[in-house]
Amino acid sequence: MADYLISGGTGYIPDDGLSAQQLFAVGDGLTYNDFLILPGFIDFTSDEVDLTSALTKKITLKTPLISSPMDTVTESSMAIAMALMGGIGIIHHNCTPEFQANEVRKVKRFEQGFITDPVVLSPHHTVGDVLEAKVRHGFSGIPITETGKMGSKLVGIVTSRDIDFLSEKDNNKYLEEAMTKREDLVVAPAGVTLKEANDILQRSKKGKLPIVNDKDELVAIIARTDLKKNRDYPLASKDSRKQLLCGAAIGTREDDKYRLDLLTQSGVDMVVLDSSQGNSVYQINMIHYIKQKYPELQVVGGNVVTAAQAKNLIDAGVDALRVGMGCGSICITQEVMACGRPQGTSVYKVAEYARRFGVPVIADGGIQTVGHVVKALSLGASTVMMGSLLAATTEAPGEYFFSDGVRLKKYRGMGSLDAMEKNTSSQKRYFSEGDKVKVAQGVSGSVQDKGSIHKFVPYLIAGIQHGCQDIGAKSLSVLRSMMYSGELKFEKRTMSAQVEGGVHGLHSFEKRLY
């Protein structure tokens, strides 16, 4: 045996790594890439890991993921998909109060399998309009009503079978000539269950099943393609009435009180006070107002990055805190305003303080990979809010476009001039609605197509579970208790360590995540 090797028992284990307290004791601001978590002992499978976590004082999610209130990330389609997967979506407020309230209403009224806001045309639209809708939305089975709107009398339907063999000169042909007429349609009455509707659709061998009320007005539609996708969502985030959970963002100005009233009438479960710097008299006054008028409504305050900021909002009565300033991929606040904080340090410092008062923390921004999600949760965050990671999914607002053969969707910061020019709500978020000269705190860009949330979020969930398994934490509550007890160990990474931890030494490679 080599002379440097010692023969003996294994009772001795050297101290290794740093506790979170030691890691953040130094004054350096740390991002998620600046450290790693040391592995622990595995005695369970990854699918046993429980990801249940508190969103607010009274709302718990089975998946700790939230979609950000940005106008290129979250409207009703995203919020529905996130809630079905066990997370929640926060509807943006860079729009009219009426539009936002209607988006919330769509989420709360959602029934799995029933499409309540399909593309609808009138008999006076043309075949060209159908072809255009097919390019934009990817399907051509479109119900035809008298006015071209939902709630109007059903007069027919146009499917690919009706138009596939028409020539280009027929593009101006009216749909009343091309459509399948009402008398030839199979329909189901309003109030039918999803199972009954599915049975009718299967027996009829049709592609679409319109749902009509007793006046023969269109109220919903079921698609055969959705039948294949229809499955149980055991993790779905629901309220006591079995409706999907939905949040919405509002500002802190006087006119936001009207927006708040409309949102509560729509059944919103929580409001997020959307401000780049939450420690303000405006936000504190708004928290007091909401808690007085709607005491049961959950209120998320922020954004904050220090315990001192958090204290004022906790004292005002918030039910959760949103943490992050200048760390988003499209955010230039730190560059322009010289204000902010690296996100790793922000999450740890605020979460460590807020937990003493039972206030959960949402890590908002800077999430580029599933590993970053695990790191945020290991630093004390209860949930993680994502923007760019969910942008360019099928459910995100906006239309796809191609650039150099790559399928993209637009993504922009709410502090970008683009967003500010669209609506004053974005200006209020950055306290600049009265400024003659607008100072941008965000940029506009594009993100590559990621496919559907229904495929992407399961990848994130599996990644978080595997991360917790490697750490040796069977649940997120165990993960946080390990961190606060000092059992969870971290290690700083040098720049060369970060290079080593990524793909390196290859001539070329393809990175497929799922």
UniProtKB/Swiss-Prot annotation:
Keyword Cytoplasm attributed: yes
Cofactor(s) the protein needs: K(+)
InterPro entries hit by this protein: Aldolase_TIM, CBS_dom, IMP_DH, IMP_DH/GMP_Rdtase_CS, IMP_DH_GMPRt
Function: Catalyzes the conversion of inosine 5'-phosphate (IMP) to xanthosine 5'-phosphate (XMP), the first committed and rate-limiting step in the de novo synthesis of guanine nucleotides, and therefore plays an important role in the regulation of cell growth.
Protein name, per record: Inosine-5'-monophosphate dehydrogenase 1b
Lineage: Eukaryota, Metazoa, Chordata, Craniata, Vertebrata
Organism: Danio rerio
Binding site for K(+): 326, 328, 331, 500-502
Family: Belongs to the IMPDH/GMPR family.
MF-aspect GO terms: IMP dehydrogenase activity; metal ion binding; nucleotide binding
Positions that bind IMP: 329, 364-366, 387-388, 411-415, 441
GO (cellular component) term, any one: nucleus
Location (main, coarse): cytoplasm
Quaternary structure note: Homotetramer.
Gene, per the UniProt record: impdh1b
GO biological process terms, semicolon-separated: GMP biosynthetic process; GTP biosynthetic process
